[in-house]
A protein has these predicted regions:
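Hydrophobic alpha-helical transmembrane segments of membrane proteins
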Residues: 1-39, 49-181
Length: 181
């Protein structure tokens, strides 16, 4: 028998909460992609820094999409969640992972080796928490002004915009290898 989550509220809201919890609090997810930044071959590619960034991070996005599907699809189907909410939760998971990934690059680029790893992790958690906190605030406003379905749409669009903006802020990191040694 599938766990009945209806006592906790909307099944869609519970699914979104699980997605957010796992995306935010699973710290070991990012893997070893940042070794790409130390690989000189990435910087020798005759391409723009934006494409180099994409080449270095694309597999992490694919991994996030697969992990999100493995997480969201079985729960959403078992709980009979509306397909719009299932797809939205899946994409929100992918965008949250992209925000985590690009925030790590951005914070590491700004702080370089000036602070220890613990301080960099705390700064990164603070920045990620602020970004996600704004998203939660926007979702609450969307629920108050419209309805719960609109909140999913708002979170989805906000996550996409933030992933792109933070990604664009990290592009300079992929220009030349020596800039952050």
């Amino acid at each position: 028998k599938v766990i009945d989550v209806s006592e906790f509220g909307s099944k869609s809201a519970v699914l979104l909460g699980i997605v957010a919890y796992l995306a935010i609090l699973t710290g070991g997810y990012l893997g070893k992609w940042d070794k790409e930044l130390k690989n000189p071959y990435l910087f020798l590619l005759p391409d723009s820094p934006a494409k180099k960034m994409w080449y270095a991070t694309v597999m992490e996005h694919v991994k996030a999409a697969i992990d999100g599907a493995i997480l969201v699809l079985p729960l959403g189907i078992a709980w009979k969640v509306h397909p719009f909410h299932i797809v939205s939760c899946w994409l929100i998971y992918v965008f949250l992972q992209a925000i985590k990934l690009y925030t790590k690059v951005l914070i590491d680029s700004f702080l370089r080796n000036s602070l220890g790893e613990t301080v960099k992790q705390l700064v990164r958690l603070g920045v990620q928490g602020g970004i996600i906190g704004i998203g939660v605030l926007l979702a609450v406003v969307a629920v108050v002004l419209q309805n719960f379905n609109f909140a999913f749409f708002v979170i989805l669009i906000y996550g996409m915009i933030m992933a792109v903006v933070i990604g664009l802020l990290t592009v300079s990191r992929f220009a030349i290898m020596e800039q952050y040694d």
